[in-house]
Design a protein with these regions (language model features):
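Secretory-pathway/luminal and periplasmic proteins that interact with or process carbohydrate-rich
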Residues: 17, 162-165
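Amphipathic alpha-helical segments within well-ordered protein domains
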Residues: 137-141, 154, 179-183
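N-proximal helix/coil linker or "cap" segments that precede and/or mark the start of modular domains
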Residues: 169-193
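A non-transmembrane, solvent-exposed segment enriched in polar/low-complexity residues
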Residues: 18-144
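Bacterial Sec-dependent N-terminal signal peptides
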Residues: 1-29
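Structural signature of alpha-solenoid helical repeat scaffolds
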Residues: 141, 145, 167-170
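Amphipathic alpha-helical repeat scaffolds of TPR domains
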Residues: 145-161
Length: 193
């Protein structure tokens, strides 16, 4: 009887563990965001979907959570009109600290190198010349054309204008590098061009 109870307990633990889906979390502090609602949104090719939300605590802390995606993909956190794009890959635990006013440009991000890289690109786009932004984004594209950072970089805009122009032969090579890399690494991914 003792062995049967132990076996049943073991089976229950295994079944519970198998039913739990892997998740990722985004947490942090928005110092002046108390009592505001923060949203976690998935940004797909067909639109944006709210995945999770919470009210920021009095001390500015928040926690958002969702099931891990099958492929790395784009998400964002949003408070009102302020948003921060993120790349989520698997079961990451991302930490973000910012003020509400600087949320869209914060670089105080840990737990995801991809998120930090696109935050750096956004900061460069905000303050640097077009040539400096082109050089910085080109380096990120060439370094890993199969990454979502490269995908983000080829579609990057500065002041509402595309940084890269697919109709220009020199720019087209970067688009081709990303498209070919995605096709090789993720042929069934919906972002494969």
């Amino acid at each position: 009887m003792k062995y049967i109870n132990s076996f049943l307990f073991f089976c229950v633990i295994v079944l519970v563990g198998c039913n739990q889906q892997p998740t990722f979390t985004i947490s942090g502090t928005i110092t002046d965001g108390q009592d505001q609602k923060i949203y976690l949104e998935h940004t797909s090719l067909v639109g944006t979907t709210i995945i999770d939300s919470c009210v920021i605590e009095n001390n500015g802390k928040f926690l958002l959570e969702s099931a891990a995606p099958e492929y790395p993909d784009f998400y964002r956190i949003r408070i009102g009109q302020q948003s921060l794009p993120l790349i989520i890959d698997s079961i990451e635990q991302i930490q973000i600290n910012s003020t509400l006013a600087e949320l869209s440009y914060t670089q105080d991000i840990s737990g995801s190198e991809s998120c930090l890289q696109i935050a750096k690109l956004r900061a460069i786009a905000r303050k640097a010349s077009r040539d400096e932004l082109r050089e910085a984004s080109k380096q990120m594209i060439v370094a890993n054309p199969a990454s979502l950072v490269a995908y983000y970089a080829v579609f990057l805009k500065q002041n509402g204008l595309a940084v890269w122009d697919i109709t220009q032969a020199s720019d087209r090579r970067l688009f081709q590098a990303v498209a070919t890399s995605f096709d090789l690494h993720w042929p069934d991914y919906d972002r494969t061009i």
